[in-house]
Amino acid sequence: MAILEQPYLDLLQKIMSEGHGKDDRTGTGTRSYFGAQMRFDLSQGFPLLTTKKVPFGLIKSELLWFLRGDTNIRFLLEHNNHIWDEWAFKNWVNSSEYQGPDMTDFGLRSQSDPEFNKIYQAEMKKFDQRILDDEDFAKKYGNLGDVYGAQWRHWEKREGGFIDQIADVIKQIKETPDSRRMIVTAWNPEDVPTSALPPCHVMFQFYVVDGKISVQLYQRSGDMFLGVPFNIASYSLLLNLIARETGLQVGEFIHTLGDAHIYRNHLKQVEELLSRKPYDSPQLWLNPEKKNIADFEMKDIKVVDYQHHGTIKAPVAV
């Protein structure tokens, strides 16, 4: 057995000791380090953090949402996944149709004002339920624009039509595995202004050698405490799914980050996490009867032997 999260723990420690203080668009402030890389050997296990509980069900449903080409949070809510709620909710409360309580700067205010947080949580609950119950409302306010699902599966071409980058890269892996063009990108400068959140994981590239497939992700911005553990598990899962469809063994997940940062209101949580001793990493189970990415459902993907420490809560910077 192996402790696969060690590169993540090492990077957290590096940012804590060597990071630079920076302001950011959320107004929270960060401790930031530019140009970091972590490597995870997926043949040794699955790099789901053990130093805190990471809800794997959310990672599964989010990745399947991306792979469906979906950009509406309704699918996520149907699977009790609230990762993207705040960005859709922001579009709703900033619209002319919203007539509820003032939600200006709801992210920061909900952290500092307990009374406002109660109002915010009630409004968010009503919003989520309306997305589930009202199809027209969901189409208008549940859609996040040109986020990952759109860019991966429906990249719009200038001359009309679209490119399915996932299908194309799988075809390349099968037919020309030595290619240096096996890339999927989510960064389209034209779409950045219309996205709820411009892509943080900008592009990823596959590499095949000796019957093994690896992937390298370039992430422009990484919330090290909340977001990056999800990204590590999500791209490791994606690589396993691609390996299954292409008949290859899994190699490495290489995670390259631009601005790797710890929010100032996460510093205590990071200290607590770093004080914990990691357990052996779990193993990933994929339904052996499924071969194609499109056929996988939630029940076909599991982690086994997942021993972990308790949850550490931290606020999301929106």
Curated annotation (Swiss-Prot):
Active site: 200 (nucleophile)
Principal place of residence: cytoplasm
Gene Ontology CC annotations of this record: cytosol
Gene3D superfamilies (alphabetical): Thymidylate synthase/dCMP hydroxymethylase domain
Methyltransferase as UniProt keyword: yes
Catalysis performed (reactions): dUMP + (6R)-5,10-methylene-5,6,7,8-tetrahydrofolate = 7,8-dihydrofolate + dTMP
InterPro entries reported for this sequence: Thymidate_synth/dCMP_Mease (IPR045097), Thymidate_synth/dCMP_Mease_dom (IPR023451), Thymidate_synth/dCMP_Mease_sf (IPR036926), Thymidylate_synthase (IPR000398), Thymidylate_synthase_AS (IPR020940)
List of residues binding (6R)-5,10-methylene-5,6,7,8-tetrahydrofolate: 223, 317
GO molecular function, one term: thymidylate synthase activity
Pfam families: Thymidylat_synt (PF00303)
GO biological process: dTMP biosynthetic process; dTTP biosynthetic process; methylation
Keywords: Cytoplasm, Methyltransferase, Nucleotide biosynthesis, Transferase
Principal EC category: transferase
Compartments (UniProt record): Cytoplasm
Residues reported in the UniProt entry to bind dUMP: 25, 180-181, 220-223, 231, 261-263
Lineage: superkingdom: Bacteria
Pathway in which this enzyme or protein is active: Pyrimidine metabolism; dTTP biosynthesis
Keyword Transferase: yes
Enzyme nomenclature, EC number: 2.1.1.45
Family assignment from sequence similarity: Belongs to the thymidylate synthase family. Bacterial-type ThyA subfamily.
Quaternary state and interactors: Homodimer.
Record's function text: Catalyzes the reductive methylation of 2'-deoxyuridine-5'-monophosphate (dUMP) to 2'-deoxythymidine-5'-monophosphate (dTMP) while utilizing 5,10-methylenetetrahydrofolate (mTHF) as the methyl donor and reductant in the reaction, yielding dihydrofolate (DHF) as a by-product. This enzymatic reaction provides an intracellular de novo source of dTMP, an essential precursor for DNA biosynthesis.
Protein name: Thymidylate synthase
Record organism: Lactobacillus helveticus (strain DPC 4571)
Upper lineage: Bacteria, Bacillati, Bacillota, Bacilli, Lactobacillales
